Amino acid sequence: MVPGYHRPAAVKVNLGAIRRNLENEMKHLDPGQKMLAVVKANAYGHGAVEVAKVAEEVGAAGFCVAVLDEGLQLRHADIVKPILVLGVVSPKYAPIAAVNNISLTVPNFEWLKEAEKYLAKENLQLKIHLGIDSGMGRIGFNEDDEFIEANKFLENNDQFFVEGMFAHFASADSADESYFEHQLEKFNHMKSLLTVKPKWIHVSNTAASIFHKNIKSDLVRFGIGIYGLNPSSNPASADLNPDIKLEPALSFESELTHVKTIHKGDGVSYGSTFVADKDTIIGTVPVGYADGWIRKFQGFKVKVGDKYCPIVGRICMDQFMVELPEKMPVGTKVVIISNNPDDPNNIKAAADYVNTIHYEVACLLNDRLPRIYYEK
């Protein structure tokens, strides 16, 4: 989408908070342990290039993305540190990754054989990380025989440099550690089958790095914590490691573009799901579901000036309406999502309201909303 620079609505990102979150995690790394900053999905909606530059300054060893194009975006922005694509990239694009020094995930043996053909044609070597499905049920090796066969294939194979081996935990943030332990056991078993020697072995995501300090991993893949958000939906989990302070970086702001009084019996928005029972002051905000502010947020309270006001009527594609307690001037500031975790319209509260997780709310805020960066 085209960013709406001439519309009073934007996502604001405090790079100072991002910096402090990264620094706090760096302090908790084990001696010799390194950090990969996860900046996939436009850095969870915060802006991949800007976040990556801060992470480079702080000392991140490299970056994780989800698709090859995200890695290429970083390279085009002169990011030179290692980049790992966590998702599956078609083998035919392996040469593009190799030329741009981007590491790819190997999901299975068949992928290796196909990628080798494309790399051999151009006499290229690709850096790879062996993905292990230890219980996520997503991508990666999960059978011993196939993994052993892949290892033999990689021995003395000039088309590949085995840079890493990794898995992803499904429940590192859960109070019940049984499945976490099952996954760790499975990963360690697969690691014992290695005949090639990766530079990096990594299993720790944000949740594992915060809640499971006993995990031995060359790298920590630090993701949601960069943005100051708790990796767990369990509020008590924030106390599992009180030394790590997470400071939310994102706020979502707009302003009133229209204010009017409607009368008893008047409806608001499509379907007239809100009908005034008395004279009511309505304010219009130029943000809608086309920006990622979905219709389920009807009823959620946003901050208009210094008052919390409910969204009334259905959220439109490009606008939504709020019920105001008093006449307010056009141009009054509207904080849709606050970066203050104590405010009732913080991102966790927004996620709870629509029965999802804050990861999704942040990622929903799309490119039509300009990102404004500041350091505080």
Curated annotation (Swiss-Prot):
Metabolic or biological pathway, per its Swiss-Prot or TrEMBL entry: Amino-acid biosynthesis; D-alanine biosynthesis; D-alanine from L-alanine: step 1/1
- A single Pfam family it belongs to is Ala_racemase_C
Q: Name one GO cellular component term.
A: cytosol
Assigned EC number? 5.1.1.1
Q: Where does substrate bind?
A: R138, M317
Q: Name one GO biological process term.
A: peptidoglycan biosynthetic process
What is the active site of this protein? Answer: K40 (proton acceptor), Y270 (proton acceptor)
Which cofactor(s) are needed, names only? pyridoxal 5'-phosphate
| CDD domains linked to this entry | PLPDE_III_AR
Q: What class of enzyme is it?
A: isomerase
GO MF, one example: alanine racemase activity
* Domain of life from the UniProt record: Bacteria
Sites bearing N6-(pyridoxal phosphate)lysine, chain numbering = K40
Kindly state which keywords UniProt assigns to this record, in alphabetical order. Isomerase, Pyridoxal phosphate
Reactions performed catalytically = L-alanine = D-alanine
Q: Which residues cross the membrane?
A: none
Hey, which family's this protein in? Belongs to the alanine racemase family.
Chain's role: Catalyzes the interconversion of L-alanine and D-alanine. May also act on other amino acids.
Q: Which NCBIfam families match?
A: alr
Q: What is this protein called?
A: Alanine racemase
Q: State the organism of origin.
A: Lactobacillus acidophilus (strain ATCC 700396 / NCK56 / N2 / NCFM)
> Gene name on record?
alr
